[in-house]
């Protein structure tokens, strides 16, 4: 326990917390260009081929973004919008690619949670 004079000399420091999506800066989303689109396998105990893309952002950072939903049309040089949000079983994947924005098409035949996947309302 510090004395009063010690606290006057050096006040208490506030804890600094690490940003979770630091490459976005202060923006909620960022635009970028796909440099590589590929699949990767999750950590144990899960098993799948998860679709991810390496994206070069407009601020110069290169990040890995997850492509949600079934099927996608992304390839190299596709322009995408990225948001924060990690994928728990994919190490290093801390961003999500937004569906139905810029070059990314929405998910086909999506009936529920359509806004998350950029799907139009079915007739």
From Swiss-Prot:
The modification 3-methylthioaspartic acid is found at residue 89. Pfam families: Ribosom_S12_S23 (PF00164). Residues 11-32 are annotated as: Disordered. One of its GO terms (cellular component) is small ribosomal subunit. CDD domains: Ribosomal_S12 (cd03368). The keyword Ribosomal protein applies. Gene3D superfamilies: Nucleic acid-binding proteins. One of its GO terms (biological process) is translation. It comes from the Bacteria. Keywords: Methylation, Ribonucleoprotein, Ribosomal protein, RNA-binding, rRNA-binding, tRNA-binding. Part of the 30S ribosomal subunit. Contacts proteins S8 and S17. May interact with IF1 in the 30S initiation complex. With S4 and S5 plays an important role in translational accuracy. Belongs to the universal ribosomal protein uS12 family. HAMAP family: Ribosomal_uS12_B. This is Small ribosomal subunit protein uS12. It comes from Methylocella silvestris (strain DSM 15510 / CIP 108128 / LMG 27833 / NCIMB 13906 / BL2). The lineage of its organism: Bacteria, Pseudomonadati, Pseudomonadota, Alphaproteobacteria, Hyphomicrobiales. The gene is rpsL.
């Amino acid at each position: 326990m510090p004395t009063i004079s010690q606290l006057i000399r050096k006040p208490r420091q506030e804890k600094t917390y690490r940003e979770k999506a630091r490459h976005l800066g202060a923006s909620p989303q960022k635009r970028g260009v796909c440099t590589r689109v590929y699949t990767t396998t999750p950590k144990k105990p899960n098993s799948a081929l998860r679709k991810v893309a390496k994206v070069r952002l407009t601020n110069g950072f290169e990040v890995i973004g997850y492509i949600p939903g079934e099927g996608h049309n992304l390839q190299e040089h596709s322009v995408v919008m990225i948001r924060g949000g990690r994928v728990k079983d994919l190490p290093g994947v801390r961003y999500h690619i937004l569906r139905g924005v810029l070059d990314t098409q929405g998910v086909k035949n999506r009936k529920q949670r359509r806004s998350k996947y950029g799907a139009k309302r079915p007739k």
